[in-house]
């Protein structure tokens, strides 16, 4: 309470439980001799010496002078917003134990640019585990997709079939080469490319099909590959979500002539920013190395195959630092541990939300029996946009960060330039309005997951 007996309250949320903090106020007043004010949405114990404040749970206790200091309050609120404090964040990058060791080792070896020792370790691990002809780390999955477009020699006027329900990079990588994206709708069960709609979209100008394994659940690759083979069209798998997932006992990313991976902060295995190009058709290996090395044959030079290297083709700088590769290698080494954690979290959501979802008309993820998913994300398909909006708002009030996902690419400003119209992809349009993703990261604690589940049970719409 302040000098006038009132509590100064700045509401960053609406889930203050006043009875649970009354005793805290009394204790802090006795210990520190000041009357607290409150700011919500601030998890964990924090002490900010600069501000002279203390934080417990979701409540920030301020001395009276701090509460009335405009500069302090402005900086504090900005700090809270910028650091995105939730009791349960949507995503949190997790360490597995050897990242710092490998980073220090890479620094000691005095090779921190691309294609150092740890880059080669990552390449070998991916090639041997997945059985691909070649794996090449890149600076992002976006850049791996751009490399794929260059390798396929995509030209202006070519057409590339991509799902409308995907990240912009899936389409943009080919648009950069002058191609026209042809947007295909998704299946209502797995949210993957609807293979039954594929053949009717193919024309004489179609050069590639890009299936996206949404949430790490495999697309129906048998059908896609059969159609692609019949029309002599390349298949590039966007496997950003699906590393180590399987379709009919075969790893995702090993079906198309090329495939791409993501090691972004939000993915199962991360180095902050990064990706990989998987080459399944050996005819593309040499040119892939050239494109990745600024259009030079530098890789052949370092293997002793030529006495000097020079500019031989188009290309760019797609090599990540070996520091990033060192971090990533620690994560890839722990792949079984990471996947086991994510599997437990995913199944716990599924088990504890299934009855609730059935009663409330909500759909949970669908995984066909012939697919082994990667446990990349867990989502709810709400009845409509209004229900989705209210659930996200309710979870935010309870300190839980939940998010929607892709907006339909065919209805984006850029997509409309390629002829996209409302109604072209009706399943995508519906799913985009209804889907909400729940927190899922390797170190999500059971008590925090229970908090999320209980908050969902309480939600009304």
Where are these regions (language model features)?
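PLP-dependent aminotransferase class I/II
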Residues: 78-79, 119-124, 129-135, 196, ...
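PLP-dependent aminotransferase-like
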Residues: 150-239, 246
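Phosphate-binding glycine-rich loop
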Residues: 115-159, 173-177, 183-184, 250
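Short beta-strand-to-turn element immediately C-terminal to the catalytic PLP-Schiff-base lysine
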Residues: 261-262, 275-280, 329
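Short hydrophobic alpha-helical segments enriched in small aliphatic residues
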Residues: 5-7, 17, 33, 38, ...
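N-terminal "arm"/small-domain region of PLP-dependent enzymes with the aminotransferase-like
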Residues: 56, 74-113, 310-312, 439
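Conserved active-site segment immediately N-terminal to the catalytic lysine
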Residues: 237-271, 300-302, 307-312
């Amino acid at each position: 309470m302040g000098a006038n007996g009132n509590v100064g309250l700045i509401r960053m949320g609406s889930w203050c439980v006043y009875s649970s903090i009354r005793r805290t106020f009394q204790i802090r007043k006795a210990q520190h001799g000041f009357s607290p004010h409150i700011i919500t949405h601030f998890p964990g114990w924090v002490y900010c010496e600069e501000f002279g404040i203390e934080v417990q749970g979701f409540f920030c206790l301020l001395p009276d002078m701090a509460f009335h200091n405009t500069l302090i309050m402005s900086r504090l609120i900005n700090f809270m917003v910028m650091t995105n404090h939730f009791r349960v964040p949507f995503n949190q990058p997790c360490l597995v134990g050897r990242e710092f060791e490998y980073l220090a080792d890479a620094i000691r070896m005095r090779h921190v640019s691309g294609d150092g020792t740890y880059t080669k370790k990552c390449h070998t691990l991916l090639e041997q585990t997945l059985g691909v002809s070649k794996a090449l780390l890149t600076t992002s999955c976006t850049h791996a997709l751009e490399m794929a477009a260059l390798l396929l020699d995509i030209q202006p006027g070519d057409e590339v079939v991509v799902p409308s329900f995907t990240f912009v990079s899936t389409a943009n990588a080919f648009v950069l080469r002058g191609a026209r994206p042809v947007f295909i709708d998704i299946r209502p069960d797995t949210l993957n490319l609807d293979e039954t709609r594929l053949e009717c979209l193919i024309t004489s100008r179609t050069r590639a099909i890009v299936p996206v394994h949404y949430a790490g659940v495999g697309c129906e690759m048998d059908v896609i590959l059969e159609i692609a083979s019949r029309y002599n069209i390349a298949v590039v798998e966007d496997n950003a979500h699906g590393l180590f997932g399987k379709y009919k006992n075969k790893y995702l990313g090993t079906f198309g002539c090329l495939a791409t991976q993501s090691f972004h902060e939000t993915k199962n295995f991360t180095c902050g920013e990064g990706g990989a190009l998987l080459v399944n058709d050996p005819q593309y290996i040499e040119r892939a190395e050239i494109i990745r090395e600024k259009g030079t044959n530098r890789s052949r030079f370092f293997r002793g195959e030529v006495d000097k290297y020079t500019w031989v083709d188009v290309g760019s700088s797609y090599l990540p630092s070996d520091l990033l590769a060192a971090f990533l290698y620690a994560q890839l080494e722990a792949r079984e541990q990471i996947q086991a954690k994510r599997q437990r979290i995913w199944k716990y959501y599924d088990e504890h939300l299934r009855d609730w979802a059935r009663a409330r008309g909500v759909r949970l993820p669908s995984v066909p029996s012939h697919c082994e998913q990667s446990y990349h994300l867990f989502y709810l398909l709400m009845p409509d946009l209004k229900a989705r909006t209210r659930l996200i708002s309710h979870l935010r009030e309870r300190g839980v960060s939940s998010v929607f996902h892709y907006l339909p690419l065919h209805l984006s400003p850029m997509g409309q330039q390629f002829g996209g119209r409302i109604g072209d992809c009706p399943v995508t349009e519906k799913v985009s309005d209804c889907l909400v993703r729940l927190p899922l990261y390797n170190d999500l604690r059971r008590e925090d997951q229970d908090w999320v589940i209980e908050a969902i049970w309480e939600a009304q719409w």
